[in-house]
């Protein structure tokens, strides 16, 4: 099942697989000399700009981060939100020792900026907006364990959720929910629109 792109002049017309987007990302770094941490900074800033535009009255933000680059984007959002005067808590999914590269760098920047970083144990009751930075476009198997619990908690919270790149639990190529998936109020997709956002379950996430 494929659903047409929304009729919006702001959306690009092409759709891409996760592998194609990863290749575009690699070429951007290698051919244009843009460092990976700079790309992550730009992605996080784009997501934070969207958060401010959609929820200008939001004051308390919960950022759920995973251990990959999606989580790294989340740390950028958290740092920018804190710098803007918002109350931010970062809730970690997965073992933080698995953080590498640019994601680890931005986790360290978050801590250096005075940010608090703790394991996920539920959505704080006073949260205004949730940022989903748990699972990215590389997901290929069903979500289980604490990840599934966190996704279910997001969906049950009644709070709007901004997904980074793709809602956690959604297959970026097929649009199939991998057991559990975040139902986001909005998704900020980087580099190119992922095919899975417009196929199968994608439009409902």
Locate the predicted segments by residue.
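A cross-family phosphate/adenosyl-ligand binding-site feature
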Residues: 2-130, 135, 139-145
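YjeF_N-associated NAD(P)HX repair module
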Residues: 2-23, 127-205
């Amino acid at each position: 099942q494929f659903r047409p792109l929304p009729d919006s002049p702001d959306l690009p017309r092409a759709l891409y697989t996760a592998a194609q987007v990863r290749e575009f990302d690699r070429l951007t770094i290698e051919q244009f000399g843009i460092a990976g941490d700079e790309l992550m900074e730009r992605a996080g800033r784009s997501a934070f700009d969207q958060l401010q535009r959609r929820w200008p009255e939001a004051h308390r933000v919960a950022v759920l981060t995973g251990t990959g680059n999606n989580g790294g984007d989340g740390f950028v959002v958290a740092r920018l939100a804190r710098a803007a005067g918002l109350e931010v808590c970062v809730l970690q999914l997965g073992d933080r020792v698995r953080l590498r590269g640019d994601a680890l760098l931005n986790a360290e920047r978050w801590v250096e900026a005075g940010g608090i970083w703790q394991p996920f144990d539920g959505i704080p009751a006073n949260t205004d907006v949730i940022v989903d930075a748990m699972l990215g476009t590389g997901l290929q198997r069903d979500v289980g364990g604490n990840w599934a619990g966190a996704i279910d908690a997001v969906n049950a919270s009644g709070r709007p959720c901004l997904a980074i790149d793709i809602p956690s639990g959604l297959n970026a190529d097929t649009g199939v929910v991998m057991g559990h998936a975040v139902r986001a109020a909005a998704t900020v997709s980087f580099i190119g629109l992922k095919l899975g956002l417009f196929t199968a379950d994608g439009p409902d996430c």
